[in-house]
């Protein structure tokens, strides 16, 4: 499954060093802005307790298909670019108290033409192997909420199967029977 690289730059600031009110979830950066940053989540505004009292936590997503290769930039370069791009919009002053950089070379699945059919074929192949399931952002939606919904449907299906006949995927393994194994252990 093709995927674009992504870097996440998290920055902690004193609340007094951020002039923007940060009331909301964050912001997205349009393609026309020509920035490495795709968007910024205002973590401390969105989630209680995410940052100590008197501080804010900002999480910038950098790279994606818009800026391939960003995940390979040095952590210092990524943090400096993200900070420089956020500063005019959020009114950042001074240096962050702390910064973290996480890089994933294959983070965002790219749903190309034929994706639904490709996933259908993959799931049909997986169905021939009891207990093997495909779930996650590569299959049913790149948003975290889509991954949770798909996992919930999968778990519900397994719970229903197990309740209905007492033989979910773990029952097959407990019996020592594997598909295409030829009867041996």
What are the language-model segments listed below?
Residues 147-165:
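Internal hydrophobic alpha-helix adjacent to the cofactor/substrate pocket in enzyme cavities
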Residues 101-103, 159-185:
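Active-site-proximal substrate-binding core of FAD-dependent oxidoreductases
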Residues 57-59, 123-142, 147-150:
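Short FAD-binding loop at a beta-strand-to-alpha-helix junction that anchors the flavin cofactor
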Residues 67-68, 79-127:
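Flavin (FAD/FMN) cofactor-binding core of flavoprotein oxidoreductases
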Residues 11, 40, 60, 86, ...:
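Hydrophobic, well-ordered secondary-structure elements that form the walls
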Residues 73, 77-81, 146:
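A generic alpha-helix signature
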Residues 1-58, 65-72, 76, 88-89, ...:
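Mid-domain catalytic core of redox enzymes
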């Amino acid at each position: 499954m093709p995927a674009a690289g992504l870097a996440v730059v998290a920055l902690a600031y004193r609340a007094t060093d951020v002039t923007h009110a940060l009331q909301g979830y964050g912001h997205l950066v349009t393609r026309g802005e020509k920035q490495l940053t795709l968007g910024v989540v205002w973590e401390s505004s969105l989630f209680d307790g995410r940052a100590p009292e008197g501080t804010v936590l900002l999480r910038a997503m950098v790279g994606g298909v818009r800026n391939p290769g960003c995940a390979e930039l040095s952590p210092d370069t990524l943090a400096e670019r993200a900070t420089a791009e956020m500063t005019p919009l959020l009114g950042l002053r001074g240096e962050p108290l702390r910064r973290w950089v996480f890089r994933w070379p294959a983070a965002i699945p790219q749903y190309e033409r034929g994706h639904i059919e490709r996933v259908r074929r993959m799931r049909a192949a997986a169905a021939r192997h009891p207990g093997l399931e495909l779930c996650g952002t590569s299959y049913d939606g790149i948003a975290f909420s889509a991954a949770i919904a798909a996992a919930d449907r999968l778990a519900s299906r397994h719970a229903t199967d197990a309740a209905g006949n007492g033989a979910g995927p773990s029952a097959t393994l407990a019996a020592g029977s594997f598909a295409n194994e030829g009867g041996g252990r």
